[in-house]
Structure formats: C-alpha cells, structure tokens
Regions:
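One-carbon transfer enzymes
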Residues: 1-234
Length: 234
C-alpha cells in the first residue's frame, strides 16, 4: 500500500539529562513516560548511580569526567566545551540538570538559553547553593521546598517554572526534611519536562507562563454536555 502523505507523526522532542549522582529525579522523569525522547544521560562522575538506571532502561549513557580536565589551562572552560560537544551530538531541544553538581561557565549557559532547566532543593530565591536543608533548619523557617527553573549564568537563579513548599516540623532532621522535599521534586520535575515537551512554557522576563493544554476548552465543553462518572481526564 502506498503510504498516505501527511500522516507521519511529529518526532518527539529530544532531551539530554545531566547527572552527578544517584539519579532519583532522572528515574522519576523516565518513569513518568513524558512525551519526549531521552536521547542520552551524561554524567561528570563515572560512578554516578543514575548511569546504571539509564543503561538498564536502554538509554545511551556517557561520562565526561571533569577530573580529566584538571591540568588544562582553563579547566572549567575545557570541561564545559567537552560537555557541550557531548550534548550537542544529540541535538536536544531540552537539557535537564538532574542533580548535576557543577558550576557552569557563562558561555555554556548562554548556549542553552531558554532550553536548559534545573531542579534545586529550596524555595528559590532562598538558599541558592549547597546544604539547603541544613540552612533552612538552622534558620528555623516553617516552609521549605523545591524549585524547577530555567538556568541562567547566576547560580540557582533564572525564571521559575514550578515550586512546591512543605511544612518544616519542629523535630525535623536534615534527613527527614530532605526526604519530604525529594518526594515533591519527583512530582515537579516530570511535570515541568512534560510542559516543556508539549511546548507550553513561555518565558516572559523573570516569569514563566504555563499555557493551558491545547484541548482544555474542548474537554471543558465536552464535560458540560454530559454527566460522566467517574470524571474523565481528557
Ligand atoms: C536533588 O535534591 C536535586 O534537587 C539536587 O540534587 C539532588 C539530586 O538527587 N540538585 P538525584 O540525583 O536526582 O537523586
């Protein structure tokens, strides 16, 4: 049968995920089956636990070891250049930093403006940097949480896509608080990747607008025309 023109499905947007460690956010994203193709998982550490998960799930993995560039004239620049090459071989629409523990050069960040996101374990702009849970406990804050944001050249800064806040309990330890925040990270990051893949994020200065799904009106109108129990999602 001659294939009919015009019915090829659009290719899924491609995503590269950068990790340094256990990769629980990577796992949450993969298991959410987002409408994108995870083209590769790249780690700066050969022993990152998330690499085994990616490999077991048939995702290409690569290591760009930052220690290999320690003797370069500009170690940070040389590492970022190698990382950029490794990423760009996959021509991703989106770069996802999922526990990627490296400070990136401005040139690297600029190259991915509007198409690189990060998850940070605090309610930004509070507590950029490391040890966020410990610092929140030391300050006695009652609300703590996590943030998904577009990456800019200022550390843990950039237009915020989504945040979740959790209450801090009087007897919380760093471990109990980080576990509750991580649970929220695993809800937020897959959703943010899905929004991006669906083309629903618009950066407007410091703010991000999340556009409604294209069929939102149709679903609402269909719901108005009938009583359906239990309610349909779409
Ligand atoms: C997460 O808490 C993330 O917010 C932070 O690093 C941690 C990474 O955890 N940037 P995992 O590797 O995704 O399990």
């Amino acid at each position: 049968m001659t294939p009919r023109p015009g019915i090829e499905p659009a290719p899924l947007p491609s995503v590269v995920v950068l990790i340094s460690g256990r990769g629980s956010n990577l796992r949450a994203i993969v298991e959410s089956t987002p409408p994108c193709r995870i083209a590769a998982v790249i780690s700066n550490r050969p022993d990152a636990g998330g690499l085994a998960f990616a490999h077991a799930n048939g995702i290409a993995t690569e290591v760009v070891d930052h220690t290999a560039y320690a003797d370069a004239a500009d170690p940070r620049g040389a590492f970022d250049a190698a990382l950029m090459q490794a990423i760009d071989r996959h021509q991703p629409q989106l770069v996802v930093l999922a526990g990627f523990m490296r400070i990136l050069t401005a040139g690297f960040v600029d190259h991915y403006t509007g198409r690189m996101i990060n998850i940070h374990p605090s309610l930004l702009p509070a507590y950029p940097g490391l040890h966020t849970h410990r610092r929140a406990l030391e300050d006695g804050v009652r609300l703590h949480g996590c943030t998904v944001h577009f990456v800019t050249s200022t550390l843990d800064n950039g237009p915020i896509v989504v945040q979740a806040a959790v209450a801090v309990d009087a007897d919380d330890s760093e471990d109990t608080l980080s576990a509750r925040v991580l649970e929220q990270e695993h809800r937020l990051y897959p959703q943010a990747v899905r929004w991006f893949a669906e083309g629903r994020l618009r950066i407007d200065g410091a703010r991000v607008r999340v556009l409604p799904p294209p069929d939102a009106d149709t679903v609402a109108a269909a719901n108005d025309r009938a009583l359906v129990a239990p309610a349909l999602d779409r």
